[in-house]
Amino acid sequence: MSNSNNNSSSGNHNSTTINNPKVNVYSNIPNSTTYTYGSGGGGTLSGNNTNNNNTNNNNNNNNNSSGDNKNHSPVTSATDRLTKMDIEEKWDNKNYEKDEREKSPLFHILASNLNSFGNFKVPSTFSLTPPEPNKQQQPQQQPQQQQPQQQQPQQQQPQQQQQQQPQQQQQPQQQLQQNNQQQQQQLQQQQLQQQLQQQQQQQQQQQQQQQQKQQKQQQQQQQHLHQDGIVNTPSTTQTSTTTTTTTTTTNPHTSGLSLQHAHSSYTPSNVLHSPTHFQSSLPTRLDTNPITTPIRQQQQSQQQLQQQQLQQIPPPTVNSFFLPPPVNARERLKEFKQIRVIGTGTFGKVYLIQNTKDGCYYAMKCLNKAYVVQLKQVEHLNSEKSILSSIHHPFIVNLYQAFQDEKKLYLLFEYVAGGEVFTHLRKSMKFSNSTAKFYAAEIVLALEFLHKQNIVYRDLKPENLLIDNQGHIKITDFGFAKRVEDRTFTLCGTPEYLAPEIIQSKGHGKAVDWWALGILIFEMLAGYPPFYDDDTFAIYNKILAGRITFPLGFDVDAKDLIKRLLTADRTRRLGALKDGALDVKNHRWFSDINWERLYQRRDNGPFIPKIQHQGDSSNFEMYDEEEMVEEPPSSNYVDPYAHLFKDF
């Protein structure tokens, strides 16, 4: 049996989402901005430009700002005129390159955005160099013709610069984008690798904890089996000195089978475990594909949580107590002494019997073959024997042997002396919230186990629940149990506990057991079922109507659980969803239940029945007595139903 700790009614699954905020190194650059050359320093957002006036103004401003030209003497001769023009022309060209470099929008883009990478300095040679003006000396008589020649290349410069600007501006931006993308990818890969390493380390730690839990649970399970005196377990070899004593069982459930076992006095501390620090120090192997999507990581984390919760409780072993049928049924029946009838049904009775050899007590279910055939219960009876002989669970009654004679079928069960839950519920009128929760939790574990075996119980009610001497539940009467892969259409069960899909003959499956659990919890807390009437068809109508009236003082969490279990739509019913019984176990009404401890029966139940001795039957109601074994028929008698129960 495995435990799983999700939260579905809580419905919560933890997931890890990787958030990698992108660092935008272009945050200072406007998305769509047109830069043009203006008369000031740097680009402006204006659309038009006057080249002639700006050029003349720049030349005039440069000349006026020059310290050498502030007090320059007037031209007195042609030679002085040429010398002055040559000096002014060189000065203008030098200032032109400097001003145009500073006015370039590309200069401001790089200067403003590349500062984040450190102390970046724009090289002095980085400029949009215009074509050099014509420096040929001309006669003094043509000064007015030279001035238009100087203005003409200056008019062509903005056009050439505007053509070169987009190409040169795009190249550094593309390089920066590529560098940033590479850095972001590297950061993402590093983060993903770190998360994968952490997940693998957590998985290793969880596996170590699970292994330790499984070892402890196996030891405790073996100790429990030793105490019950059921299996023959050899003494285990240990590092410390142990003493082994062989004893004969006196357990009332198994001593009639004449089994012996060896008790080994070992403790959990004697078992050697590998140190956790050594296991955690082992190198971890990274995944071959470390880059995964957040959706994939969420799915993996959900699957891991489900597996961890399901692996907390080990699966129960196969029923190793079941014995093959005896060679001679009549001789086998002579070994038992009939005490009294403790239960009755439509086609049979249940007897308390005692083994005459060792004095142990059992419950014998006797069924008349003719009645079984007349009521068309052959398939159900064969299914009950087949299922109980192949399963074992702490909260399901154990079947030890099945055999038949010429007229009857016999099922040998363990005797549960605490009586039926139905009897105790009628005496106390109703159970407390804690008592009902304890019984319901053990039933949830039993149903979870059965459903994993594809077994539908279909007859959950207080009459089929027994209480043992430690106060724990034992589910009995598997007459309606059936292995179902998908759906079945047989109409069977108790009217007050039938699910709507059974009444409507739509086909039913495992979801009907969760509906019956909701009815049972309501009845344990209220003292009566939610859908009750003297007329069977009136009960069916109330079930289909789905109106539930809760009494005053009903627990709020229990009310919410019952409403979720008693959902008419089986596709939305709690327990029948994707996570199955895990949704029921994660409901807040069961928040204080330790499922692993409950499965291992570490604590006694809330109610310990009064049992004077092993064969005490005072907790069962009185029934009319009837002989368990009939007289053998004549030697010429031929069993007409032998072919129907050949595998019994």
UniProtKB/Swiss-Prot annotation:
Low complexity bias spans: 1-20, 46-67, 136-175, 232-254
Record protein name field: cAMP-dependent protein kinase catalytic subunit
Pfam families recorded: Pkinase (PF00069)
SUPFAM superfamilies (UniProt xref): Protein kinase-like (PK-like)
Record field: compositional bias (Polar residues): 255-290
AGC-kinase C-terminal domain span: 591-648
Recorded superkingdom: Eukaryota
GO molecular function: ATP binding; cAMP-dependent protein kinase activity; protein kinase A regulatory subunit binding; protein kinase inhibitor activity; protein kinase regulator activity; protein serine kinase activity
Name of the gene: pkaC
Function summary: Essential for differentiation and fruit morphogenesis.
Region entry Disordered, spans: 1-25, 40-86, 121-175, 219-290
Entry's Gene Ontology BP terms: adenylate cyclase-activating G protein-coupled cAMP receptor signaling pathway; c-di-GMP signaling; chemotaxis to cAMP; culmination involved in sorocarp development; establishment of cell polarity regulating cell shape; G protein-coupled chemorepellent receptor signaling pathway; MAPK cascade; negative regulation of gene expression
The EC number(s) this enzyme carries: 2.7.11.11
Keyword field contains Kinase: yes
Binding site for ATP: 342-350, 365
Naturally occurring in which organism (per UniProt): Dictyostelium discoideum (Social amoeba)
Record family assignment: Belongs to the protein kinase superfamily. AGC Ser/Thr protein kinase family. cAMP subfamily.
Keywords, sorted A to Z: ATP-binding, cAMP, Kinase, Nucleotide-binding, Phosphoprotein, Serine/threonine-protein kinase, Transferase
Domain Protein kinase, residue spans: 336-590
